Regions:
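Rossmann-like dinucleotide/flavin-binding elements
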Residues: 392-422, 465-472, 482-544, 573-581, ...
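Flexible, Lys/Arg-rich cytosolic regulatory linkers and terminal tails that connect or flank
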Residues: 356-377, 560, 616-641
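Rossmann-like dinucleotide-binding cores of NAD(P)H-dependent redox enzymes
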Residues: 420-460, 516-517, 522-567, 614-616, ...
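Flavin-dependent oxidoreductase catalytic cores
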Residues: 1-399, 405, 410-420, 429
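Short, structured coil segments at secondary-structure junctions
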Residues: 300, 323-324, 460, 528, ...
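Hydrophobic beta-strand scaffold positions of dinucleotide-using enzymes
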Residues: 39, 265, 477-478, 584
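Extracellular/periplasmic ectodomains of large secreted or surface enzymes and adhesion receptors
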Residues: 354, 365-403, 450-460, 476-504, ...
């Protein structure tokens, strides 16, 4: 990879002096990029049920362009009906898709961003209920996660799919996209051909690495025969599965791609079975996989894209300056704050809405649609902005009892719409259950969420008072309630997390529970020196949260001297063990009335409740409901008059 030409400080925009490499220009194939701010491809499910481009998808991606991302790589677009990976996957498999693709390309152009359409085929990593037919793959080997037997592709079918990729690239170019990215990573069809882990063929498409590369290189050649468009290929540097590709094989693949004329190489990691490597959770190192991209960048001269939980300018700047990549891809951070580049450019990094890698966005990619706890506008970007800008016709004095991410969000929105909002808090710390979470080793980033929500509310004029409301202060009172599953007893995991149940050091402590709160209570106790065992009747821990938390806490609890025991029929421990109770089962399904705690009941009768929760998806649901409450038009109730 060529060295970076850095602009002199005098030529940089305000706020960019701290990251001159990030603001340096770059040529990517035919594209001239003014800087290195690029958004990674991420599934949203914002397409229509037939795979059509929707206004929702256009608004979502265009908001990132307007926010300063100079390059946006779209989510994967299906090249063939057998390759649909999600219910609402964007499809580029037929010329009837051209009009919709053109609308998306036009929206990106109008936003100021260059756009690259990622084209893909899921291979064995899908479900037949999405494709409507049996899955296809290099070999008849099921994905261990999906466990559906695919059909091995015949030679003539492989040629047909090569042409399908080329046709999808042609459609993307005709629609007005500035480039195309072939998705050859993460275990999808092209990646499946590349790896001996999933490719057991004995013909010219299997066996040696040269043979396994043939399908991908045929696609590249076919596209190149028709166009010199900017062409990027995404690969997994290491698949992190036994028998899968490692950096050695991937580096050879990268060299071959350069020889066949690609414009850039996007370096990711993993397959479905090692999914946690692709979507690291809070507590994992930022920029973790950038060194792998750097190893490949040293072997090729085309620009290399890098990934790995990049959420701050300093990490991206160091990656470019150190030669680890030419283009650091902002993924979930771009969901959390579409204006991230603009805020960095203006020297307002403290105003960036932080991504803490809670993975609620990823956890919902195959379910309804992408959402984000710090940014309730995701997926309704245009509508949310219009509603936020609409002044409340009858401004009220609104009091909110309690601070949590949801209540601070409601306070911000209500104040932005013209209401006079005061938040009352009598607990020692701001932030509710996410404030508690900051005390857990590796989870301190959740304090960033609370701090950002507090700054945003204060910027809209919200007051936070450390007392109860007085008579006549509020015309409406909204109160925080907490999702705290019944039956935990006392002391319980929430007492430990909150810090209201302190134990003398060096005890034997038995934590009973199977959810995220139980695991993090166990981790917190182990970290301060208790001999801690986490027991659950479930098959694993953290089953109510993203699988990444399961992986990190299975590692961290033993690292701090604790133990994890699953599938326990009857809790047991040493005679001297102090028991800390938690929910016996992972939370889910219907929420019972006694699953709610009302810590602010003494403040008076609430006109509405705002939900606080520990587990990220429930927390985020509370944020979205609170946003809707604040967007509504409450009638004056005469409270306190």
């Amino acid at each position: 990879m060529d060295p970076v030409a850095v602009r002199p400080a005098s030529a940089l925009p305000p706020g960019a002096a701290r990251c001159p490499h990030l603001f340096s220009p770059l040529r990517l194939g035919r594209l001239a990029l003014p800087d290195r701010f690029a958004m990674a491809p991420m599934t949203t499910n914002f397409a229509g049920p037939d795979g059509e481009v929707t206004p929702q998808l256009c608004d979502y991606l265009a908001a990132r362009g307007r926010g300063g991302f100079s390059l946006v790589v779209t989510e994967n677009m299906g090249v063939h009906p057998t390759g649909r990976v999600m219910p609402r996957m964007v499809m580029a498999d037929d010329d009837r898709r051209l009009a919709g693709l053109a609308r998306l390309a036009d929206a990106m152009r109008a936003s100021g961003a260059k756009s690259i359409a990622q084209i893909s085929h899921c291979g064995r990593q899908s479900k037949s209920k999405f494709t409507g037919m049996q899955l296809v793959a290099p070999s008849a080997i099921p994905c261990p996660l999906n466990r559906e037997m695919p059909r091995e592709l015949a030679i003539d079918e492989i040629g047909h799919l090569v042409r399908a990729f080329a046709a999808a690239a042609r459609r993307a170019e005709a629609a007005g996209f500035d480039g195309v990215e072939i998705h050859a990573a993460h275990g999808y069809l092209v990646s499946g051909f590349l790896s001996a882990y999933s490719n057991r063929r004995t013909d010219r498409y299997g066996g040696s690495l040269a043979n396994r590369m043939r399908f991908l290189l045929n696609i590249v050649d076919r596209i190149r025969e028709a166009s010199d468009l900017t062409l990027v290929v995404r690969i997994s540097a290491d698949e992190f599965v036994a028998g899968g590709n490692t950096l050695e094989q991937t580096t050879e693949i990268a060299r071959a791609l350069q020889a066949h004329g690609v414009s850039g190489i996007s370096v990711s990691v993993g397959v479905y079975e090692s999914f946690n490597t692709q979507s690291m959770v809070s507590g994992e190192a930022e920029g973790r996989w950038l060194p792998l991209a750097g190893r490949i960048a040293r072997e090729v001269s085309v620009p290399v894209f890098g990934v790995g939980r990049i959420r701050r300018a300093a990490v991206a700047e160091a990656a470019v300056a150190g030669g680890e990549c030419a283009i650091p891809l902002f993924g979930r951070a771009a969901i959390a704050d579409p204006e991230l580049p603009a805020k960095i450019r203006a020297g307002r990094e403290e105003d960036i809405l932080p991504c803490v890698s809670c993975n609620v966005c990823l956890g919902r990619a195959a379910r309804p649609q992408t959402i984000c706890p710090i940014n309730p506008s995701v997926g309704r970007d245009r509508e949310f902005g219009e509603r936020l800008d609409s002044a409340a016709p009858a401004p009220l004095r609104i009091g909110i009892a309690g601070t949590c991410l949801a209540s601070l969000t409601a306070a911000w929105i209500a104040a932005a719409r013209g209401h006079d909002v005061t938040v009352y808090e009598t607990e020692p710390d701001i932030g509710g259950m996410q404030g508690w979470r900051c005390s857990v080793p590796s989870q301190g980033e959740y304090g960033e969420l609370v701090a950002a929500a507090q700054r945003r509310a204060a910027g809209a004029g919200v007051r936070i008072l450390r007392r109860v409301p007085q008579a006549g202060e509020c015309e409406r009172l909204w109160a925080v309630r907490r999702f705290q599953p019944a039956g935990a007893g006392s002391p319980n995991c929430y007492d430990v997390l909150r810090g209201t149940h302190e134990l003398p050091r060096g005890l034997d402590v038995l934590v009973q529970g199977g959810d995220l709160a139980a695991a993090e209570a166990a981790l917190k106790l182990a970290a301060v020196g208790h001999r801690t065992e986490l027991q659950t009747p479930l098959a694993d821990i953290c089953l109510d949260a993203h699988p990444g938390f399961r992986a990190i806490h299975r590692r961290l609890i033993p690292e701090h001297g604790g133990r994890v025991t699953t599938a326990v029929a009857k809790p047991s421990g040493t005679p001297a063990a102090r028991a800390v109770a938690g929910p016996a089962t992972a939370t889910g399904g219907e929420v019972a009335p006694d699953d709610w705690a009302y810590p602010y009941a003494s403040f008076g009768t609430a006109d509405a409740y705002i939900d606080d929760a520990y587990e990220p998806s429930r927390m985020t649901a509370g944020v979205y409901e609170a946003a809707e409450l604040a967007m509504a038009e409450p009638a004056p109730r005469g409270r306190g008059e």
